[in-house]
C-alpha cells in the first residue's frame, strides 16, 4: 500500500471529516499528471466534502491493497482489462460490488458520464506509458552505442598488439570436429544419465560450517582432502597468435625448477618414498604427482592413482592463461617443450581412468581435447584411440563426420583402426530403429562397401580378429591364400604394431552375432573378388609394402602409454632398449629446453659396484668425476648417459667369446658318474 493511499484512508486530504464506506474516491494518476490537467471533472458519485475527483469507486478499505496494481494493467481500446478490476475486489465483497453497480445505474444523468470519463482516464494512462517507453528506448540506444564504442576500442587494441582472443580457425572443419563441450568434461554428467542424480550425489552432503569455496575448474573438482592450494610456481605464457590460432607454453619459476631437479634425483633413486617426501614440501608438483600415480597404479591402488592425477590437472588448470580455452580448438601447446608434456600426459592418464570407470563419452571429450592441442603433429597419436572411444560412447555420427572431413588431408583409411571402425559405425547406425528405412539401407550399403575395402587392404586382420572373438572361421576362409596365416606373417612390422594395437583394444566390439554375420557376408564377397583377379587386390598389396616400412615415434609413444601387451611386444628393439620414463616417455629428438638441469658431482665410492664397473667401460670415464662442460651441448641428460652405457655393454658382450671346453678324459668318467 502506498503512502498516498494511506493518507486518503486516514482522510487527511479532507481534514478530519469522517469517511463513509461508499464515499471514498481515489485517483489512478500521479500527482504530476493531476497538476497538469487543471480543473477536475466530476464523476457520477460526488464526495461529501466538495468538488470530486475522477477515480474509481471503492466500497471496501481493504481494496486499497490492490488498487495500485491497476496502474500497471494494459489498456485495450480505451478500457482497462477486467481481470485487474475483479482481482481488486475481495471474494467476500462481490455482493457489495454488485449493489454498488446497481446503485450507480439508478443515479440518472451522473452515470452517463462515467464511460467517457473512464476512457479519458485510460487515454491519459496510455500517454504516460508511451512517455516511459520513449525514455527507456532512448536510454537503451545510448547504452548500445556505448557498448559498440567499447567493442571498437578493444578491436583497435587487439589489432595494434597483434594478440587476438583465440577463436575459431578460418577453416571451420577442424573447429567443429575438435570442439569440446564443458559439460561433457565432467564424468558426473555421464554417470547421472546412467544411474540418476540421487545415486551419484547421494553421498555428497553440503557442509554449512567452514565451507571452502575453491576456484571453479572444468577438468576436476577440488576435494577437501587435498592440501591447501598455493601457487607452486607454474604459469602459462602466450607465445604468439596468428591465423586464428594461439600458441601457449607453460613456464617454471626458479622455485619450481628446484623442485623439478629434486624430482629427477628422486626418480634416479628408484625409491617412491623419495617422491612422497618431495610432495610434502611441494604438494602440487605435477611430475611428482604423475610419477607417484603410476607407482600407486602398479600396486593396484586405483583410487589413489586417480586422485593424484586429478590433483595434477587442478594444479595446471589453475595456471592457465586468461586467453587459453579448452573448448575453442584454437589453442596450441608445443609438445617439444618439456613443460607442456606434463599436461598432455595428465590428460591422457585421466582419460584412461575415465574409460575404465565406464565413462566413454567423457573420455571421448578428453581425447578430442588432447588432439586439439596439436592436431597436425599429434604427439600422443590420439587418432589411434578416438575411433574406439566414439564407438564405445555410441557416438557414431561423430566418428563418421571426423572420417569424412579428415580423410582428404590425413588419409585416415590407411590406419587399420579407422579402416574397420568406420564401417562398423555405419553398420551399427543402420541397426537403429528410429532412423528412416531409406537411411538405414544407405548406411548398410556404405558399411558393406567400406568393410570390403578394409579387408582388401588389411587381410591380416581377419583371422586374429576372429580368434580374439572366439569364433572359428570357415575352412574356405582359413585355408585361402589371401586370408590364411601367410597374410599375418607377411605384413610389415610397423603394420603389425597397428593391427595388434587395434585388436587388443577393440576386438570385443565385434562380438555381437549380427555384426559377425554381416562380417561373414562381406568376407565371402572379398574372396570372390580375389578369385576373379580384381586389380585392387594387387594395388593394395603394393601399397602395404611402401607405406608401412617404419612407424613414427609418436606411434611408439602411444603404444607404450597404452600398455597393451600384444602391441608392446611388437615394438622394434631400438625402442625397447631405451630407458623409458613414465613422466616423459620417448621425448622428441628436437626438444626445446628452456632451462638445463645442473650436473651433480657424486663421489665414486658411493656408487654401486656393478654400475661402476660398466661406467668404467665408457671412454669418458674419470676417477675424479669431472664436471662436463656447461650448456646444452656439454651437459648430457640422464637418458643420453644411459644410452651410452647400454651401447658400451652391447659392444662388450658382442666381443666377449667363451673358449671351447675340452672334451673330458676317459679317466674322469667314473667321477662324472657320481652325479647320476
Curated annotation (Swiss-Prot):
In the embryo, widely expressed with highest levels in brain. In the adult, highest expression is found in the heart. Repressed in cardiac tissue of patients with heart failure (at protein level). mRNA levels in the heart are unchanged in patients with heart failure. It is found in: Nucleus; Cytoplasm, Cytosol. Pfam families: Tcf25. Keywords: Cytoplasm, Nucleus, Phosphoprotein, Repressor, Transcription, Transcription regulation. Component of the ribosome quality control complex (RQC), a ribosome-associated complex that mediates ubiquitination and extraction of incompletely synthesized nascent chains for proteasomal degradation. In the RQC complex, required to promote formation of 'Lys-48'-linked polyubiquitin chains during ubiquitination of incompletely synthesized proteins by LTN1. May negatively regulate the calcineurin-NFAT signaling cascade by suppressing the activity of transcription factor NFATC4. May play a role in cell death control. Residues 1-59, 85-147 are annotated as: Disordered. This is Ribosome quality control complex subunit TCF25. Belongs to the TCF25 family. One of its GO terms (cellular component) is nucleus. One of its GO terms (biological process) is regulation of protein K48-linked ubiquitination. Residues 123-136 have a biased composition (Basic residues). The keyword Oxidoreductase does not apply. The keyword Transcription regulation applies. One of its GO terms (molecular function) is DNA binding. InterPro entries: TCF25/Rqc1, TPR-like_helical_dom_sf. Its main location: nucleus. Component of the ribosome quality control complex (RQC), composed of the E3 ubiquitin ligase LTN1, TCF25 and NEMF associated with the 60S ribosomal subunit. Interacts (via C-terminus) with NFATC4; the interaction leads to suppresson of NFATC4 transcription factor activity and is reduced following stimulation with angiotensin-2. Interacts with XIAP. The modification Phosphoserine is found at residue 602. The gene is TCF25.
